[in-house]
Design a protein with these regions (language model features):
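DNA polymerase processivity clamps
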Residues: 1-31, 37-88, 102-222
Length: 222
């Protein structure tokens, strides 16, 4: 990965803050309203390690996080704690070109139930046994299967919508990471075909988050 992509892109415009993280296989986006309007547009990249430190501090308090941006550094204040780090330099991925919009197949899913189903079929998959999860989206059902040297696993989850019997493969951990990050009880799964990314968005269309995961090409017998 390019050094710039070890950080998170912040885009600040008016009263909106958008944060984007990417690697070679997935993209995560979260968007919030700022408590006070910024009044101008800002774009900068903060190292992920610094954000993890800020998250640890925020986890112990209800304090508001305030940041002050310099030309090469950013300063976070959280209650009585202060964190300063150097910004990353370089050209961040143009995420607007990468993140699909208006995918034709939209399925409403219960996040907890789908997470449970994928966790169950993922029990026979490990870092050494990197078999994909084979997902088949039908009419109001999602069928998940996995095969490894340990054995086979199968689970079914109820969904709302018609997936047109589409079959698509994913890295189990990447799919679970996205589902576990969703703050809602339900989300919208959006797809095009078996070789295109899956995107998870809010059912209300608010754009508060988007999680994109690239598929794994399935082989016969997997």
């Amino acid at each position: 990965a390019r050094p710039i992509h070890t950080g998170c892109l912040f885009e600040v415009a008016d009263d909106s803050i958008t944060v984007v993280a990417v690697d070679g296989y997935r993209l995560a986006l979260r968007r919030w309203k700022a408590e006070s309007p910024i009044g101008r547009t800002l774009k900068f990249v903060v190292p992920a390690a610094a954000l993890k430190e800020a998250e640890k501090i925020l986890g112990d308090t209800d304090e508001t996080c305030t940041f002050f941006l310099g030309s090469k550094h950013i300063l976070f204040t959280i209650g009585e704690a202060t964190l300063v780090c150097r910004l990353l330099e370089g050209e961040f991925l143009d995420w607007r070109r990468v993140l699909p919009q208006n995918q034709p197949i939209k399925l409403a899913v219960n996040v907890a139930k789908m997470t449970d189903s994928i966790e169950r079929v993922g029990l026979i998959i490990s870092e050494k046994l990197k078999s994909p999860v084979r997902c088949r989206f039908g009419e109001n059902t999602a069928d998940f299967r996995s095969v490894s040297t340990i054995g086979e696993a199968h689970d079914v989850c109820q969904i709302a919508g018609d997936g047109q019997d589409m079959e698509i493969g994913f890295n189990c951990r990447y799919l679970l990471d996205a589902l576990r990050a969703i703050p809602d009880s339900e989300c919208s799964l959006e797809l095009v075909n078996g070789l295109s990314p899956i995107v998870m968005n809010p059912c209300d269309g608010s754009g508060r988050y988007s999680y994109m995961v690239l598929p794994v090409r399935l082989k016969a017998g997997e």
